[in-house]
């Protein structure tokens, strides 16, 4: 796995985008096969669970070596007209354990859509506190649920 280099030939190139309005990469891609995914291409298409839960190879990114990214829950109980999450992921449900995401690292950026709306999410937050992991709840926290 490596970042795409237009000077190289590849067996397979994966391209993804979140939004339909994101412009496509309109240049020649030197690959035998090109796989496009993400909600920007097809809201119905999903990855096999064993692929979706793979953790990134952090060594190819220029980030803090003690940092990890992930989701503890997927889905959302709200049905905001403008949001694709309930349609794509369904109701909120457990997804991964914090220790699977961090794998010994002490910092995490969590991208859950509504972690406080789930008992599992609350249990994971208690575990995060117990393990002393510093967390950035990147998508925010629903203030209506913090009481």
Model-found features: residue ranges?
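Short catalytic/ligand-binding loop motif for oxyanion handling, primarily in non-cytosolic enzymes
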Residues: 22-24, 42-46, 78-82, 89-91, ...
